[in-house]
Amino acid sequence: MTTLTTLLALADSRLPIGGHVHSGGVEEAVTSGLVTNLETLHAYLVRRVRTQGLVAASIAAAVHAGTLTVAAADRETDARTPAPAARTASRAQGRGLARLARRVWPGHDWTALGRAPHLPVASGAVGAVAGLTPGQTALSVVYTTMTGSATAAQRLLALDPGDVAALTFGLAPLCDDVAAAAAEEPADLSDPLLDVLAQRHSERERPLFAS
């Protein structure tokens, strides 16, 4: 498998790590009336990419480059994820990615990841073993941060798939810029609104998405 093919596979929404059941907070944003159409979805995605996307991608890039150990990165991710519900969602997806990695690269020792690493931590470890660069790993994390929420909003608001696809294409330069910044050093931004949305969603009865 070539590096480009591996990058595309890791960024594929069909990757069986459970990402399809997570909306990245957009379900709660829709329910709360904060995201109602393409314009407000665009604003939400930009905000999420610049904050949560940057932080997650920077942790992944640091793990990939070896500037953070898996254990240290796990602690750093906990510290940067105030909402317990968001930490749970991150570990659920990280567990799925670690499980897949053990099948795809069975010759590698994945013991350090443990059972349920945070998703950015697992992403960094997988990117390194897969032969990507830290920047490519960061881009994969930023891209899936954006597309996961975009696809969820499309379903929740019954948006035209073509319109949503065009919106995500338009955000490509932002994703590139954020990924480049993420590859430089771990970021420590936070967004209280996104934390509140994540926690409130976990307390809602019968949501469509897990987070």
Curated annotation (Swiss-Prot):
Q: Which Pfam families does the entry link to?
A: UreF
What keywords appear on the UniProt entry? Chaperone, Cytoplasm, Nickel insertion
GO CC aspect terms: cytoplasm
Query: In terms of domain of life, where is this protein from?
Result: Bacteria
Q: Is Transcription regulation found in the keyword set? A: no
Q: Where in the cell is it found?
A: Cytoplasm
For molecular function, the Gene Ontology terms on record are:
nickel cation binding
| Family from the record | Belongs to the UreF family.
Subunit (UniProt): UreD, UreF and UreG form a complex that acts as a GTP-hydrolysis-dependent molecular chaperone, activating the urease apoprotein by helping to assemble the nickel containing metallocenter of UreC. The UreE protein probably delivers the nickel.
Q: What does this protein do?
A: Required for maturation of urease via the functional incorporation of the urease nickel metallocenter.
Report the protein name in the record.
Urease accessory protein UreF
Quick one: which gene encodes this? ureF
